[in-house]
Design a protein with these regions (language model features):
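Conserved ATP-binding module of the ATP-grasp superfamily
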Residues: 124-126, 147-150, 167-202, 235-237, ...
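ATP-dependent carboxylate/phosphate-activation module, predominantly the ATP-grasp catalytic core
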Residues: 168, 198-265, 269, 276, ...
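ATP-binding N-terminal substructure of ATP-dependent carboxylate-amine bond-forming enzymes
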Residues: 1-104, 135, 366-372, 378-379, ...
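Short, flexible turn/loop "capping" segments at secondary-structure junctions
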Residues: 152-155, 232-233, 376-381
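Short, well-ordered beta-strand elements within core beta-sheets of diverse protein domains
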Residues: 162, 199, 241, 300, ...
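Short beta-strand-to-turn element immediately C-terminal to the catalytic PLP-Schiff-base lysine
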Residues: 131, 161-166, 211-213
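A conserved helix-loop-beta module that forms one wall/lid of the active-site cleft
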Residues: 94-160, 182-185
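Peripheral (often C-terminal) accessory segments that flank ATP-dependent C-N-forming ligase machineries
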Residues: 25, 120, 137, 312-418
Length: 418
């Protein structure tokens, strides 16, 4: 199984799970990438380096060339990394291996093309327009109206996304987003740095994780997102299963399935983000891959569905074997802790365990002594992600509240004072 783009080090657990399932992994990534260590750790059988420039056609050819030189003919190709979905789709297609069509994956990868195709297909679509300059942003505002959202065409984790409420705010917001949306800030923007302005969506947001097989949805898990930290839309957390109005959630799931089917994303594990708005269900974005962070652990804990195994089987054209629990087996709360202020991180006083929980994972993203940005900088630094599983949602929430009762401590200080 060729894995194209191993992603950040937190993705190591996905590769370990694939190895546990018996997959012989060959990782293809940029020279010097951390994933080379997966071979010495016994997780992967081989690793190949291939240059990445951000153009999907060029990057796919580089992968094909590396495989040809190594004399490797894979049985399947996959990725769990957003940056690499278009490359993986092209490599699979070139080798005649299972996967979604490159044009369908491209339409999901580009938030602008997602809106254009969705509107063309007659699906309910927020107003949106491409933006390459401040003048174009003003022109787009005349079409989209306010409130609106400025976001990058290519991105993840709400990076560079910000709400705008009036014309006077446009120059400052444009300047702020432009500083973020660059390859120097994050490699994901090697794919392009165009922006879009789109209609703001009210309501409650959800993550919808789908398992598709031959165009049919076999399984859908819904996680309910908590209100984001506007104006930046940084995520604050979620819980699973969802507790929102069931009929509204069902309508959103139906729209998610209809959207991926209409796009031509007929197989594998997909991650769709949407909202139940005052005007009905709306799609925020479509990801032609499994959800990131701890989503696959959450889905397995709650519904007894292994999304990694489902994706592996799909990429090998093996029949699906998922048997979801009829009722939630447990409940999960995932909390993202941001820096409360700008300065030097003095303490992260989390408890390292919680009584009576099924599972607890704390992923630290910052260390004591680091300079951190608070909400005054719009995009606050993520300090930690806490995932707690308990017998029910009420218990999971209570245990999480106890765990996080002492907030992070930040003291005044400049980045040079470490």
């Amino acid at each position: 199984m060729v894995v194209i783009g191993a992603g950040y080090e937190g993705k190591r657990r996905a590769h370990i799970r694939m190895a546990e399932l018996g997959a012989r992994l060959l990782i293809v990534d940029e020279p010097g990438h951390w994933s080379e260590s997966l071979v010495s750790d016994g997780v992967a059988v081989a690793w190949l380096g291939a240059p990445v420039v951000g153009d999907a056609d060029q990057d796919a050819q580089a992968v094909l060339d590396a495989l040809a030189v190594a004399g490797i003919r894979p049985d399947g190709v996959l990725t769990f990394w957003e940056d690499s979905v278009c490359v993986a789709a092209r490599v699979a297609a070139a080798l005649g291996l299972p996967g979604n069509p490159p044009e369908a994956v491209d339409a999901a990868r580009s938030k602008i093309r997602t809106r254009e195709l969705s509107a063309h297909l007659g699906l309910p679509t927020p107003r949106a327009q491409r933006v390459r300059s401040l003048d174009e942003l003003f022109a787009a505002a005349a079409y989209v109206g306010f409130p609106a959202v400025v976001k990058p065409e290519f991105g993840a984790s709400a990076m560079g996304c910000i709400r705008v409420d009036d014309l006077e705010s446009l120059p400052g917001i444009y300047s702020l987003v432009r500083r973020i949306v660059s390859p120097e800030h994050n490699a994901i923007f090697r794919a392009g740095n165009d922006l879009l302005l789109e209609e703001y969506l009210d309501g409650v947001e959800f993550d919808v994780d789908l398992v598709m097989h031959e165009g049919e949805c076999l399984f859908a898990s819904v996680s309910e997102n908590w209100p984001t930290a506007e104006p930046s839309f940084q995520e604050t957390g979620l819980h699973c299963p969802a507790t929102h109005d069931r009929k509204a959630v069902r309508r959103l799931v139906d729209l998610c399935v209809q959207t991926v089917q209409s796009f031509g994303l007929w197989s594998g594990v997909l991650h769709v983000e949407g909202k139940c708005t005052s005007h009905g269900p709306r799609i925020i974005e479509v990801n032609a891959r499994m959800g990131g962070a701890r989503i696959h652990e959450i889905v397995e804990a709650v519904w007894n569905v292994d999304l990694i195994e489902a994706q592996l089987r799909s990429c090998l054209a093996l029949p699906p074997t998922i048997k979801p629990s009829r009722r939630p087996r447990s409940a999960a709360v995932n909390t993202i802790v941001h820096a409360p202020a700008t300065g030097r991180l003095a303490a992260l006083p989390f408890a390292d365990r919680a009584a009576d929980c099924v599972d607890l994972t704390i992923d630290l993203e910052a260390e004591v002594g680091d300079h951190v940005d608070g909400p005054d900088q719009v995009f606050a630094t993520v300090l930690a992600e806490v995932t707690l599983v308990a017998k029910n949602l009420r218990r999971a929430r209570a245990l999480t509240a106890d765990l996080l009762c002492n907030p992070p401590q930040v003291v005044p200080g400049s980045p040079l004072e470490r």
